Amino acid sequence: MDSPKTLARVEVKENGDTFNVKAYEKAVKSYITKRKPLGEALDEEIMDELSVKFGIVDDALEDLFKQIQDAGISIVDKDGNPSPLALVTDEIEKEEVSDTAMDEIVTNVRIDDPVRMYLKEIGRYPLISLDEETKLAEAIIAGGEGAEFAKQMLAEANLRLVVSIAKRYSGRGMQFLDLIQEGNMGLMKAVDKFDHTKGFKFSTYATWWIRQAITRAIADQARTIRIPVHMVETINKLIRVQRNLLQELGRDPSPEEIGKELHMAPDKVREVLKIAQEPVSLETPIGEEDDSHLGDFIEDDVIESPVDYTNRILLREQLDEVMDTLTDREENVLRMRFGLDDGRMHTLEDVGKQFKVTRERIRQIEAKAIKKLRHPRRSKPLRDFM
């Protein structure tokens, strides 16, 4: 629903008022949040809660289905199969899986030798006609010894389809070959579930499963710290708006400017931008010779500094020398009262029980010992640490 032109085509009014873009986007977001934990949504439910209510038709309806699918939610019919309403948005042209198209992928997408070898390998499998596709589907449904062979033939004939779809998702944090592998798993699921009697081509049906497999893999694996699928969509939308505003304004847009375009509070924009940041490894090489790492230049504000550590050791040594000038009982009372040994300060009553005397007697011993320590001869070595 990013295009204002698409929204402008929606002429149906809600409750007699003009179309409310903000209310519609809020309803879509709420619906995605509700269905995300389940992983799928009924096509009839989408039509009732969003399409009919807000008058979403034609291209805007296709955009709605795509937005829901991009959030990692499968759109199914009442039988749990991919909805024909959602399938119409994913038609792949024959030219996109031709030999020429595969050559263009090699040219336009950054790929390594294993991918080139794979593309060369799948180029050996010919595309099949609609009649051949139907015969293979019938053989699969019939079962028997020929079913597995038919599944293999149908899958091999559509391996190029997976590559064509995976190309659209390159540059989103996963290697191109990994995208193809995830898409192939979606293709195998489509082969197992395809029913040619429903009236749509296998390529149309398979595209739905391939896209679902790839988008979910990106959400789960593309980042070091996993981000929920619905948040990935929000991040992508925000980045698109940020990029457009950068071109228009000639500078980085502020959170307020981005929020105005997205109908989002500036604080929420800042939160999403923070989530969108990729973590950086402390092992990242720094310098031309890569002889140091990022972690070498980051201060540890938790560990004690060498200066503080040295001062603490010297203070303890001086304190021990001063305490040695007291009687054993006076020294032990002060050590317990102020936690000089274990860091735990004891009450007068606790110390009294230890020495088998009253609280008042401990207080008197403590006062006498402190008075001794305040003598200039004893306190002078400690004043340098204050």
Curated annotation (Swiss-Prot):
Region annotation (Sigma-70 factor domain-2) ranges: 154-224
Alphabetical GO biological process terms: DNA-templated transcription initiation
Region entry Sigma-70 factor domain-3, spans: 233-309
Record keywords: Cytoplasm, DNA-binding, Sigma factor, Transcription, Transcription regulation
Function: Sigma factors are initiation factors that promote the attachment of RNA polymerase to specific initiation sites and are then released. This sigma factor is the primary sigma factor during exponential growth.
Sequence similarity: Belongs to the sigma-70 factor family. RpoD/SigA subfamily.
Entry protein name: RNA polymerase sigma factor SigA
